[in-house]
Amino acid sequence: RIKTTKYEHLLPLLTQVQDNQEIDGLFLLINTVGGDCSCGLAAAEMIASIKKPTVSLVIGDSHSIGVPLSVAADRTFIAPTATMILHPVRLNGTIIGAPQTFEYFRLIQDRIVTFVEAHTGVAKSRLERMMIRQGMMVKDLGTILVGKMAVEEGIIDEVGGVSEALFWLHQEIERSRKKRQEKK
């Protein structure tokens, strides 16, 4: 049995975060082994477009499509022992038998890399090198980043936990409230 993660249920919830005046910010706890690339990227785009303070905390794993989900927030944290895995787009059990399938996978991967580059400042070429790195994982390509390694690579803003992420979020919410009051 293959474990996958689906993100469809998040899309209407993210819309509510933006639309509901009683919600002042968003705190994302990320612990995923990956899953649906299309929905994951859609959720990441929605998170990035929210005009309220957003913060993410990687607390276990942020593998595959979890990377764009993690970096979509205004501020990103990773627990010291949490991992992020960057690897090429793939589909379990699929044999690529047509050039169109390969091109489709390449298009999905390019969309993901472009999003991560835009939200981290890490160059596309560096992200692609990490995705195809050999030797770090048995029978697979990719790079495993643990805690501060993700910060050193520029993918995550800082190492921290719940208290640091909430502290940042509360500061930003207060700053947003003050700006709204000044406009009145």
Language-model features, listed with the residues they occupy:
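N-terminal organellar transit peptides
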Residues: 1-67, 71-184
